[in-house]
Amino acid sequence: MMAAASLSAYDFPAPGGKIISSFGSGSKGEFNTGIDIQADNVFASEAGEVLYYGPDFIAVAHEDSILTLYSHVTASEDISKDVHISRGQRLGRTKGGVFHFAVYDLEMERYINPLLMTDNIKKSELPKVKGLSYDSAGGMLSVYLSDKGLQGLYMVQISVDGQVVSSLGFRTVRRKGDTLVLDREAFEYGTLYGREGAFTFPGIHLNPGDNSVDVIVTDFYGKKVVFHGRITV
């Protein structure tokens, strides 16, 4: 997988644009493979060669087997297949004021969170943990987070009695059979978003009695918030 350090050389494709849907979020029954940005104009995130362009889609090939994908974009007149483009070159205009931006690693066959390469969200707030629920029969722990701050969400960890037992990172999405999985095979869409307004972690087994459960939420720049809870089984 391409390291975050090398991806950081890429530019945000819409300076001043607003992220309205984050990577890995639940959308239309599957994970969002990129980010949705509210903006009028779209610019090349890095120099490369136009691999494909159509009525509302542009794909640009870069070094290191990386593609940047721009959906819901009407291409500029100077954009055509195989043409070389420079970093920051205007690619086109959005349709309806919103476009989808994705980064795909051809070698690793997975989508990479575009926010690994931009400081666009440095000032975003971390989400707050509103509560926990536990299904002892299924070993499912649900974490309820506030919507505010989800754009900057990088990792959620579950710690039971001081030991990390599960970790969910918003780094990559890949295809597994007919579905998409987030970060690790354990996190399929139907499991993670099975309860409305919650992230559900499978395979969490709590001991009978009182359990100390911590939820550690981290953003892309290492800021953390910790929620301390107790669950009695």
Positions of the model-derived regions?
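Short coil/turn segments at the loop-to-beta-strand junctions that recur within blades
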Residues: 75-76, 121
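Aromatic sugar-binding surface patches on proteins
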Residues: 175-202
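Beta-strand/loop nucleic-acid-binding surfaces
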Residues: 68-75
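Surface-exposed, glycine-biased beta-strand/turn segments
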Residues: 4-64, 86-87, 95-100, 110-169, ...
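Histidine-centered divalent metal-coordination motifs
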Residues: 72, 98-104
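Short beta-strand edge segments in extracellular beta-sheet folds
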Residues: 230-233
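Glycine- and acidic-residue-rich phosphate-binding/metal-coordinating active-site segment common to enzymes
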Residues: 106-108
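Short nucleic-acid-contacting surface segments enriched for D/E, G, S/T with interspersed K/R
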Residues: 78-86
